[in-house]
């Protein structure tokens, strides 16, 4: 009744080994090849971007003496997810060094994500060639920006979203197969590592079930299902109502992704263009009697429209400013995964077929373009930052020196805009240096946008750092007295009167007197 079979899903049967593995070894090898290709195209940066939010929670469990100050800005996320605990468990059980464990975890997250796409493709097409076209297209586009959401399909480093992503795709497959217990288990795992992203998948799975239930009835099903989904989306809003404070308002100004009315025109296109594309997919699938593609496409149209309406609702009235942290347009993450998987399947069926030159004509330029985009995004860093290798980036070099040569309880002052400095490549200080720091406008403001009680502390400290570019020795002594700061990281040429035991061409690490 619940779809819990003795055989289980493909991933479970593969892991069991034996004859099942023998029957699927070609699939496994192909998925491994695509995983390696995805790594080569999109790169790997363990300590970049949102790793600054997620990895300090792992490091805090491994070394409780770390981060005597500012831990609330990453602990607010860490306390809502099992990601730090699962990562520590993974490292300890396998006796892996920290960086090696992160790298292996990232590679496996790509593999399981592509495996999930492969399983879902089986519901869309019976032909292996077209299925591989779909999976390959997704693999080539892993770091494609999802409209204006500040998300990629899959990030270039291990984080909860990557784990949630493959679990959510597995869940959608189970719903299509009416294996609801398996779907529930996958969604439970996804929720345990990321409390927000799976909520969109849950709503989509409910939508799939509801649309099938209404199928064949006289009533117009889409408005009924859409209204039901909208109500489900708005249920948690009551707990979040409350006027935003001035400090909170300042924090969310750094996160235009939360407010669709601030998006650029091409980001709006990333919301509206899929509607036409998915409707077209549904018409093609109907003619071919590809039932799953038709169901997914029509459901995604309703799904997109409902969340688009919710995003507009939360963006227009100022009184709803604090509710924008629900980020309805993050629903596009699942939509993009499914849309590009189906697009690849249709390309494989109608365009690529068995013509090798057509496959090369599509995937070679596409892969080179995605590779070039990543090099432009991380120009001062190695494309794949392998574990335990010396960093190429001067900022990462300075952060690594700090980790090895400064007291674990040291508190550092940094430019609150340091992650936006050209050549810094969005390397996180906390996660790379494993030291406390003053607040920033990139990641700590993100924590504030999700957890409003942090706003006053963040804003007060940010005000104390105002005018950083013109700071002199007296200014550093002032913030030392106020916040216990004992070190600072400065761009060259630095500030006169400070002792700086480490310097490179871009950065100085200075001890405050």
Regions found by a protein language model. Give the residues of each.
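Extracytoplasmic
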Residues: 377-513
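Transmembrane catalytic cores of multi-pass membrane glycosyltransferases
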Residues: 39-52, 62-80, 195-201, 210-336
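Membrane-interface transmembrane helices that cradle and orient dolichyl/undecaprenyl
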Residues: 163-182, 214-215
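Hydrophobic/aromatic-rich transmembrane helices and adjacent perimembrane loops
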Residues: 322-350, 359-362
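Active-site lumenal/periplasmic loops and adjacent helix-entry segments of GT-C-fold
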Residues: 34-114, 120-138, 145-164, 192-199
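Signature aromatic-anchored transmembrane alpha helix within multi-pass, membrane-resident enzymes
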Residues: 349-378
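Membrane-interface alpha helices of multi-pass inner-membrane proteins
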Residues: 172-174, 181-195, 201-206, 228-232
